[in-house]
């Protein structure tokens, strides 16, 4: 089957009047379009089997053939093709029926060359926009970093995720920091029937209860100090789509009843506004915390947990996905050498062995950071162990069996692991329980 041209649309004309076909063809070919003609439904069907068309002008009166039946067959045979109905004044009602059946527009005979050219340009522009949208949706559905896996454990998780994505069930994603929980959430949205709507993310640890309520549900002007203008809130932004609650274990306990009510009833009020609103939102949540333990300690509501974990997905850590380590490393390297215009083209055997032997406490995020650094500092085609910044005993890896480590060595390993698993220095300092200035001194001390 031939491919449609990229720059000039391929057009099919279907009419049982040869004079109409000839006039339309000359007009469109003068504009540079590639045009094929058919004087019957059978001829049109044959052409559609052999070629790809972007646009069809279809006469509703095709001798003994019913134009609506031909349209229905075209929608099956070439669903991407735009179809414009050509009709007489007396059949406008039928043309309206055709639009309801899937036609893009209609022209009334006799039509001028300008009308034909305008209709063609309009429909081909829509076709190009549709093709771009399909390409973007294809990108959304492509496996992201860490989701294109050869690990049986990870493949099982992804299979379940694809199966439940088409439902509206709430999903709780569990896994260590850096395992790709956010990427999986966005992939689930992309695989779902809500993919054309927004996927809105809230990072729960970043907001206190008051700010979280405003961020989630919105507020009116003057609702609190500093509220100089009204905001819609993330729930409203996600209407028809997906709301992803990242690190749900840090969601303020005092606000959990309002979140529970929204999940149950799809109803909420903006801060400072008594009007009850509704939003159709699918909830995805993720955490690296043990929510069941938090429930036992009265730090998380049990009823909210039950609402969130209709489906639970457990992402395995990278150390349990050894099949994926080198694949991911190669992919990251290819990306970063292109981004930074660096010479590296692969890893030495020693570097590959080191990558496989490392425990990756920071998981995929840490691997990405290590490879990015290596791609920048490596001056040659092969990345060596020295470029990885790992050495024989990488910071944060498990202690060597039988080796006695000093307190300084243990501290260096621990700080290195936390740094690798953190997006920012402030986040790492918070995890370590020290201030940023202390962390800065420790990094200098241990050359991290």
UniProtKB/Swiss-Prot annotation:
Family matches, as PANTHER family:
ALGINATE BIOSYNTHESIS TRANSCRIPTIONAL REGULATORY PROTEIN ALGB, TRANSCRIPTIONAL REGULATORY PROTEIN
- All copies of the Response regulatory domain together span 10-124
The segment(s) forming the Sigma-54 factor interaction domain are: 147-376
Record-listed ATP binding positions:
175-182, 238-247
- Note the DNA-binding span(s) on this chain: 425-444
One biological process term from GO is:
regulation of DNA-templated transcription
Q: Which organism is it from?
A: Pseudomonas putida (strain ATCC 47054 / DSM 6125 / CFBP 8728 / NCIMB 11950 / KT2440)
- Sites bearing 4-aspartylphosphate, chain numbering: 59
Keyword terms, alphabetized = Activator, Alginate biosynthesis, ATP-binding, DNA-binding, Nucleotide-binding, Phosphoprotein, Transcription, Transcription regulation, Two-component regulatory system
Q: Which Pfam families match?
A: HTH_8, Response_reg, Sigma54_activat
Known PROSITE patterns for this protein?
A: RESPONSE_REGULATORY, SIGMA54_INTERACT_1, SIGMA54_INTERACT_2, SIGMA54_INTERACT_3, SIGMA54_INTERACT_4
Q: Name one GO molecular function term.
A: ATP hydrolysis activity
Q: In which pathway does it act?
A: Glycan biosynthesis; alginate biosynthesis [regulation]
Role this protein plays:
Positive regulator of the alginate biosynthetic gene algD.
Q: What is this protein called?
A: Alginate biosynthesis transcriptional regulatory protein AlgB
